[in-house]
Amino acid sequence: MTKNNSLKLGYDYDAWHGYGQRDVLFTDISLKTNSHMILCGMSGSGKSYALVWCLKMLILASPPEAEYFFADFKQDDSFAFLRGCTFYYPYKKSLEALEVVYTILHKRQSGEDKNRYTVTLIWDEYMANILALQGEDKKKTADVMNKVSEILMLGRSLGVRFICSCQ
């Protein structure tokens, strides 16, 4: 496969239903153009499948030194193939993935880490994780949301990307 920064999102709904045309929708997934992503949909709509596809395309489009941290709050079988990986954080450990990526962001911001290869935090069922955490510890929930906000605001220029799925 060749390196390609285009990610197929699906088809233009209006073109299909209005005119019977199958117009493909793409987005550029290079860090300079599209640093963060959110995949939303109803239960059973294919968000986890789309996240696997997105991960595949990111890996194919990225340099070999790029790192991916996968927080899998739902921990169903969709990402079972990742369970043996070092950068896979299931269910209750999903917050550890955030801490690792947040530390990388701050080391880069302070100049301690001069690297700018892409570091991506992929978080499946982010909002479900936040809501579950909120029921346990509101202060920790606020801390998590602040860290995610910081990654979203500062990440692009430091080579740190956030991708999540939610309902």
Spell out what each predicted region is.
Residues 2-111, 117-120, 127-167:
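P-loop NTPase catalytic phosphate-binding loop
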